[in-house]
Amino acid sequence: MRRRSRMLLCFALLWVLGIAYYMYSGGGSALAAGGGGAGRKGDWNDIDSIKKKDLHHSRGDEKAQGVETLPPGKVRWPDFNQEAYVGGTMVRSGQDPYARNKFNQVESDKLHMDRGIPDTRHDQCQRKQWRVDLPATSVVITFHNEARSALLRTVVSVLKRSPPHLIKEIILVDDYSNDPEDGALLGKIEKVRVLRNDRREGLMRSRVRGADAAQAKVLTFLDSHCECNERWLEPLLERVAEDRTRVVSPIIDVINMDNFQYVGASADLKGGFDWNLVFKWDYMTPEQRRSRQGNPVAPIKTPMIAGGLFVMDKLYFEELGKYDMMMDVWGGENLEISFRVWQCGGSLEIIPCSRVGHVFRKQHPYTFPGGSGTVFARNTRRAAEVWMDEYKHFYYAAVPSARNVPYGNIQSRLELRKKLGCKPFKWYLDNVYPELRVPDHQDIAFGALQQGTNCLDTLGHFADGVVGIYECHNAGGNQEWALTKEKSVKHMDLCLTVVDRSPGSLIRLQGCRENDSRQKWEQIEGNSKLRHVGSNLCLDSRTAKSGGLSVEVCGPALSQQWKFSLNLQQ
């Protein structure tokens, strides 16, 4: 009995020693790590998830499997002193919190650098697994006088919500900010490199400098006031890894400029533009939405990207001509690169399983040499002259003042287009953006018929219905009209019709008929009014709230001021 007790005691002692050895040698690391309370869902810097390690760390990659040794002078992002970095630039009492950045800096400065944000992805994305052999990326972020708190959150969100082995580096390109330490101090953070321009270069040239310095095979461009969401990077890298000619963008969520609330954006949007070449968001057509019901997280082909956030193969970026280096400051570059990618054999996609928040401002916080309008027109003219062929005339019809803005030498870009064997703009319209209505050869004015911030609208009415005004939405549809050479004001096959030729009578929508005098209109007074030919009365909105638009005796009233967004007769 005594011998049996000794044996049991020995076995128990060996068992305890075995457990201790197992824990000490790392076999219990998952358990040990789980006891800390600092871990957060989706934080790739945690080590309490063996599943994540198995899925996302390449076999044999010892650095990815363990903790890397930092170079001298570097710190991990959780150890970076946010208070010291942000504190000296905070808005003082009595100062305008919007003055420096055109967003509420006070609210931005209150937030922690790794604040939690809602996971806005579709449920299917949260269950999806991504390839384990994805390439690493260099993240290029350019900035000029950015609020330190916003810039820091951008950097931290990249490091916190990305698999460490997929972030080769973060390259901050300081475009000659007033305070060099805005970027220099962030250079202490792991994986962050800082480049500073010795003069103001603008977004395009700064991004090219960052791309040229990048060491990874894939480039990720981000604006300097973003917050990356959970698992944002893998879906983008996977699409590029499958086809290097894809240029991919996340769904861009909204960070409110006033209170910095993070709000998920619709997944039913694509990038587009009007003939003024200003970027806009287009809703998918009903047919496109129906076709996605079986797979709502499938990539979305988009005619245009917003330009601030996208991922692209580095070698393809170089082969395709990088950016137009003669574009200045900001604006038009997304238009130019979108045309170039599509027309030269690539594609643009929005990836629903990738979400990145962005602070959308109503105006720019920095100055433009010559004014923002002139810079945008110059950049846009360069894109139009190189890529739009004969369709550029619709741009000049929409923005007549652009004709007077010098756009510089474009010979090298034209030669690039020829060298790459790019398709004509008509191909782009037919195959990539068929939703963009092209004016008919019979049209002398086209697009929205604007009165201040309101536009002429069918209000969903059909034949014999009245028309009204509604806030301009720039989406065509019920607000798309054309004035033809036959003097008809048309919406599809319906025309504005004066049934009763007396002042105050309501306008009706009726089927267009050739030579019907009730449907004849002309622009007068510098194309600022529409006069009915048969009655000499003018289109008027004064009765819009009580029943619909009418014709009235022509006069100086603002209710008679109308302007087509695209006027082909100047």
From Swiss-Prot:
- Annotated region Catalytic subdomain B: where? 299-361
Cofactor(s) listed in the protein's UniProt record: Mn(2+)
Under which name does UniProt file this protein? Answer: Polypeptide N-acetylgalactosaminyltransferase 2
Q: Which family does it belong to?
A: Belongs to the glycosyltransferase 2 family. GalNAc-T subfamily.
Write out the function statement from the record. Answer: Catalyzes the initial reaction in O-linked oligosaccharide biosynthesis, the transfer of an N-acetyl-D-galactosamine residue to a serine or threonine residue on the protein receptor. Has a broad spectrum of substrates for peptides such as EA2, Muc5AC, Muc1a, Muc1b. Probably involved in O-linked glycosylation of the immunoglobulin A1 (IgA1) hinge region. Involved in O-linked glycosylation of APOC-III, ANGPTL3 and PLTP. It participates in the regulation of HDL-C metabolism.
Q: In which pathway does it act?
A: Protein modification; protein glycosylation
Cytoplasmic topology: which positions?
Answer: 1-6
Q: What happens when the gene is disrupted?
A: GALNT2 knockout results in significant embryonic lethality. Surviving mice show decreased body weight, abnormal craniofacial features, and neuro-behavioral abnormalities, including deficits in coordination and impaired responses to acoustic stimuli. Knockout mice have reduced HDL-C levels compared to wild-type littermate.
- Region described as Catalytic subdomain A: spans on this chain: 134-239
| Tissue distribution | Widely expressed at high level.
According to its UniProt record, the EC number is 2.4.1.41
